[in-house]
């Protein structure tokens, strides 16, 4: 019981420090809810969470001990702004979770995210109301963390963004990630 209390305290401290020193973000209700979600989901069965940096082209995995692994990755288009609507080929930013692990016929290893979620819909509706996107635009979906095709790992080596908005890892590294990341793992995608 004492160890569990210490672990939860350390997780809380780490999350608070991470979000307070991240100058590009201000703590808000969505981030606070995400921290709470991380604490709820990080158990012995699922100690992981993922932070994806579009700026650094990195997917970082953390566990109860802190940093666990880093994988280079690529995204949708070279336009690294937040996803606005279906078809823009941008990778969405925000807090998500892995909802399905599946084998895709094109690249095998795929971790489907819960995009669009409530926060995604709020941003989408606001942008639509502000006239930033057409009234008939759709939000899109099917965003995942997945592998390249086996013969196309070079796309990651050369930071060649190629997906329709997903996050893509080298085939071999996606296989590694897929082997230990469970459904329910929290994922943050940031600029």
Go through the PLM ranges and name each one.
Residues 66-78:
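Short Gly/aromatic-enriched secondary-structure transition segments
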């Amino acid at each position: 019981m004492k160890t569990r209390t210490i672990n939860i305290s350390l997780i809380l401290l780490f999350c608070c420090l991470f979000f307070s020193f991240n100058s590009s973000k201000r703590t808000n209700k969505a981030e606070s809810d995400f921290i709470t979600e991380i604490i709820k989901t990080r158990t012995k069965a699922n100690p992981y969470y993922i932070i994806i940096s579009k700026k650094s082209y990195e997917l970082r995995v953390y566990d109860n001990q802190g940093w666990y692994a880093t994988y280079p990755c690529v995204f949708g288009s070279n336009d690294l702004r937040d996803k606005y609507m279906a078809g823009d080929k941008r990778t969405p930013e925000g807090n998500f979770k892995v909802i399905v692990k599946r084998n895709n016929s094109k690249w095998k290893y795929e971790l489907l995210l819960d995009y669009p979620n409530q926060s995604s819909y709020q941003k989408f509706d606001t942008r639509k109301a502000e006239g930033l996107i057409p009234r008939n635009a759709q939000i899109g979906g099917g965003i995942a963390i997945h592998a390249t095709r086996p013969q196309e790992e070079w796309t990651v080596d050369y930071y060649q963004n190629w997906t329709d908005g997903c996050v893509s890892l080298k085939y071999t590294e996606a296989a590694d990630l897929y082997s230990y990341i469970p459904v329910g793992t929290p994922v943050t995608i940031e600029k």
